[in-house]
């Protein structure tokens, strides 16, 4: 499945409950100069191909001033799972205790995070 880049307005609509339909959504927050973010891209694409029932997005934090504080995370890459609707459920993936040297998050941990949240949605 393709990964769609979204802008600030789209992000705030998804996370703010303006998307009324119920969908499972995963968003990767990245930075243009973040080597871990770029290294994570092929894994993120592969995982999106494995989950046809989930919408995958990417948001460039270079245009997201103030959003880390608003959403309560620090640094990129960061991944979150959202169950959209009038009252969206938003869960951020925890930072790894032992980060993967190349991609920060371990691919298996990302898969488990999505699987667990799809089950709970």
List PLM regions with ranges.
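Thiol-based oxidoreductase modules, predominantly thioredoxin-like and allied folds used
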Residues: 4-8, 29-30, 41, 45-66
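Structural micro-motif
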Residues: 65, 71-83
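N-terminal "domain-start" segment that seeds a small globular fold
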Residues: 1-16
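CheY-like receiver
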Residues: 14-18, 67, 113
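Local sequence-structure signature of Cys/Sec-based thiol-disulfide redox active-site neighborhoods
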Residues: 13-50
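Conserved beta-strand elements of beta-rich interaction domains across eukaryotes
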Residues: 31-33, 63, 84-87
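Non-catalytic, surface beta->alpha helical segment in thiol-disulfide oxidoreductase systems
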Residues: 81-121
């Amino acid at each position: 499945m393709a990964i769609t880049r979204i802008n600030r307005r789209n992000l705030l609509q998804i996370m703010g409950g303006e998307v009324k339909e119920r969908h499972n959504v995963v968003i990767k927050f990245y930075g243009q100069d973040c080597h871990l973010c770029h290294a994570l891209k092929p894994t993120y694409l592969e995982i999106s191909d494995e989950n046809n029932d989930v919408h995958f997005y990417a948001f460039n934090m270079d245009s997201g001033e103030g959003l880390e504080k608003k959403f309560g995370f620090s640094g990129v890459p960061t991944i979150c799972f959202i169950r959209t609707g009038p009252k969206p459920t938003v869960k951020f993936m925890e930072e790894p205790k032992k980060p993967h040297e190349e991609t920060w998050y371990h691919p298996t941990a990302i898969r488990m995070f999505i699987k667990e949240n799809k089950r709970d949605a």
